[in-house]
Swiss-Prot record:
The lineage of its organism: Bacteria, Pseudomonadati, Pseudomonadota, Betaproteobacteria, Burkholderiales. It comes from Bordetella bronchiseptica (strain ATCC BAA-588 / NCTC 13252 / RB50) (Alcaligenes bronchisepticus). InterPro entries: AAA+_ATPase, ATP-dep_Clp_protease_ClpX, ATPase_AAA_core, Clp_ATPase_C, HslU, P-loop_NTPase. The gene is hslU. Residues 130-158 are annotated as: Disordered. Its main location: cytoplasm. GO terms for cellular component: HslUV protease complex. This is ATP-dependent protease ATPase subunit HslU. Pfam families: AAA, AAA_2. The keyword Cytoplasm applies. It comes from the Bacteria.
Amino acid sequence: MSANHMTPGEIVSELDKFIIGQNRAKRAVAVALRNRWRRQQVAEPLRHEIHPKNILMIGPTGVGKTEIARRLAKLANAPFIKIEATKFTEVGYVGRDVDTIIRDLTEYSIKQTRELEMRRVRSHAEDAAEDRILDALVPPPRGASGEPERGEDNSARQTFRKRLREGKIDDLEIEIEIAQPMPQMDVMTPPGMEEMAEQLRGMFAGLARDKKKSKKIKVREAFKLIVEEEAAKRVNEDDLRAAAITNVEQNGIVFLDEIDKIAARQETGGADVSRQGVQRDLLPLVEGTTVNTRYGMVRTDHILFIASGAFHLARPSDLIPELQGRFPIRVELDSLSAEDFVNILSETDASLIKQYTALLGTEDVKLEFTDDGIRRLAELAFSVNERTENIGARRLYTVMEKLLEELSFDASANSGEVITIDAAYVDLQLAETAGSQDLARYVL
C-alpha cells in the first residue's frame, strides 16, 4: 500500500519496524504525508492554495534523522531526493546552484515513471519478443507488402513457441536485428554547468537512436533485449514526461540534510556571505517557484521539504528569518540510550544481528545471540559514545564489525558450527578495546 493512502497511525507503525523511538518526528512526517492525500480530496480552487508544511528535524548525529527520510521515501513511493545543503553555493559562485535539486528530483521522477510504464506494457512486449524470436527461427511467409504474415497454424512455429516458453532453446544462437544501445557519453563540464552536460548527452544519444544492428546472440539474451526494446516502443515519451512532472509537483519530497552547516553564527566571518547566499537561494524553492528542467517547467509550490541538522555550533534561529518561517514544523529528536541500542539490535526488521546472521549463514556458520550478549554489546557501544565522540546508532556498526572480525575472516574454517554470542564472548572480544579510551577512540 502506498503511504499516500495510509493513515498517520499506519505510517508510524511502518516506520516503527525500522526506527526505534523518535515518535515526535515520525508523527510529524506521517501527518505531512497524510495531508498530501487530504489536499487531493479538496476541490479547486482551494486545493491550489493549500501548501505543505515543511519540517525541520533537530537532533544529534546517528539518532534516526536520515533513516526516517530514507524509509519515508520507500514508503511514499514518490519522487524523493536527499541532498547535503553544504554541496551548494550561491548563484554566481563556482559550484552547484540550488536549482539542480529540482532538476535531479525530476530526473528521478522520469526514471520512476518510466519503470512503472515499462512494467505496465511488459506482457505485450513479451508477446512481441516471442514473435520476433520465432521469426528468426521459423521465418514466416511475406505478404504483398513485404511484411511477415504470421500464422499460428504452422506446426513448426507452434513447436518452437512451446520450447521457447519452457526454456529448452535458451542456449540456441540466433541472428537478429536489435536496436543499438545509446552511447555512454562522459561530458566534462565545470561545476554549475550540469544542465549543459545533460543537453550534450541527450544530443549525442539522439544521434544513435533508431539504429539497428544484426547480432548473433543466444535466445535467452535476445529475449531480454527485445522485451526492453518493444516495451520502450509502447511507452509514449510525451505522456511519460507530463506524468513525471505532475508527480514531482504534487508528490515530490526533498530532504535537506546538514542545513545547520549553512546557518551562520553572528560572531563568525569569512564564508558567511556564501552561506547566507545559499539560504537566500533556497527561499524561492521552498516558498514556491518555477524551475526550468530539460523535461519542461516544474513548479515547486507543493513539494514537501524536510530539513535536518545537529545544530551543535549553530541554532535554528541562526538561519535567516525568511527561511525559518518556511519550516513551521520543528521536531527535536532525542539522544539514544543503552536501552534504545538493545531495541535497535533486537527489534527492528533489518537489524544488524539479522544482517550478520544471514551473511555468515551463507557459509554455514550459525550465529546465536543471547539476550545478555545483546545487552552487553549495547552497553559497550553506549559507553564508547559517552567517553568519545557520540555518533549515535552508527557506533553499533563499528562495534559489531570489531566483534565479528575474526569470525568473518575464518568463516569457511568454522563451517557447520554454531557460535553463541553471549556476554562472555562480547567481553572477550571487546572489553579491552572498549575499556581503553585511546583504543576506543581509534578502533571503535
